UniProtKB/Swiss-Prot annotation:
Assembly, per entry: Part of the relaxosome, a complex composed of plasmid encoded TraI, TraM, TraY and host-encoded IHF bound to the F plasmid origin of transfer (oriT). Interacts with TraM, probably through its C-terminus.
Pfam family, one: TraY
GO cellular component: cytoplasm
Role according to the record: Conjugative DNA transfer (CDT) is the unidirectional transfer of ssDNA plasmid from a donor to a recipient cell. It is the central mechanism by which antibiotic resistance and virulence factors are propagated in bacterial populations. Part of the relaxosome, which facilitates a site- and strand-specific cut in the origin of transfer by TraI, at the nic site. Relaxosome formation requires binding of IHF and TraY to the oriT region, which then facilitates binding of TraI. Upon binding to the oriT region TraY bends DNA 50 to 55 degrees. Also positively regulates tra gene expression.
Protein's name according to its UniProt entry: Relaxosome protein TraY
Gene Ontology molecular functions: DNA binding
Length: 131
């Protein structure tokens, strides 16, 4: 059964709903990597969208468990990939993102991907000014 929402999916923000036990996996992963929870979730979502463009979910195995919320800001490419994935599945962006982050946390608990990051090679790419 496909679900269709009434809100626009073009925004770059996603409010992620994670079950409490999965959120603890995210906290552990972010502590190991030194990244924030939100950044860790975005990196994992991006990797999952590239690895599994046609993700077959097994269904919501968590039901109505307690959830924690996490707001993620997506870049343009990840947002477009997520919109395409949610259009294929018929789920909303929030559920699509949550299922993918949960699946990635379970399949790849120790995930460190340095290929996603690029070095600042131009002056305008540098975030902080030197003193």
């Amino acid at each position: 059964m496909k679900r269709f929402g009434t809100r626009s999916a073009t925004g770059k923000m996603v409010k992620l709903k994670l079950p409490v036990d999965v959120e603890s996996l995210l906290i552990e992963a972010s502590n190991r990597s030194g990244r924030s929870r939100s950044f860790e979730a975005v990196i994992r979502l991006k990797d999952h969208l590239h690895r599994y463009p046609k993700f077959n979910r097994a269904g919501n195995i968590y039901g109505k468990s307690l959830v924690k919320y996490l707001t993620m800001r997506l870049d343009d490419e990840t947002n477009q990939l997520l919109i395409a994935a949610k259009n294929r599945s018929g789920w909303c962006k929030t559920d699509e993102a949550a299922d993918r982050v949960i699946d990635h946390l379970i399949k790849f608990p120790d995930f460190y991907n340095s290929e996603i990051f690029r070095e600042a090679d131009k002056e305008e790419d540098i975030t902080f000014n030197t003193l």
